[in-house]
A protein has these predicted regions:
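Catalytic domains that recognize anionic headgroups
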Residues: 1-149
Length: 149
């Protein structure tokens, strides 16, 4: 897609995937697809089937649902705002148990959840994330162990 072509021309898009053995991108994973997280997790679960449970793996998933546009997660919304942002997060959260359940069947798993940036929704008159603002560079972080069941 045009968006992924632009991304690949940027330094991060050219270099970052090279740090991984495998890198996958499909348009159905994009931020404009309302079911992108479901599709990303479906894809990840299918890939996990190729590895025995005792095989250690590193998996990085950049959930695109939180990126704009996210207004489609609230019926009738036409502009992103804190409500649609929260709805996108709830959608992502609703999909994670499927992934976590599979990892718990494999082995103890370290999960690191974080964002690459925040998003302004009117703070100090700013919108979105292509600016230097505390809201943009203050990001959530959590890590935890999923224990094998």
């Amino acid at each position: 897609s045009a968006a992924s072509d632009v991304y690949k021309r940027q330094e991060l898009g050219r270099v970052f995937p090279g740090y991984f053995t495998k890198s996958y991108w499909l348009p159905i994973f994009g931020c404009t697809a309302p079911d992108s997280t479901e599709k990303q997790i479906d894809f990840a679960l299918k890939k996990l089937e190729n590895y025995s449970a005792d095989k250690r793996i590193f998996m990085y998933i950049n959930f695109s649902a939180i990126h704009y546009p996210n207004c489609h997660y609230v019926k009738g919304k036409t502009k992103d705002d804190k409500e649609s942002h929260a709805a996108a997060l709830r959608y992502i959260d609703s999909q994670l148990p499927r992934l976590f359940e599979v990892f718990q069947k494999r082995a103890d798993t370290l999960v690191i959840a974080l964002s690459d940036h925040g998003t302004c929704y009117g703070e100090d008159g700013y919108e979105y994330h292509c600016i230097s603002h505390e809201t943009v560079y203050t990001v959530p972080y959590k890590h935890f162990i999923l224990t094998k069941q």
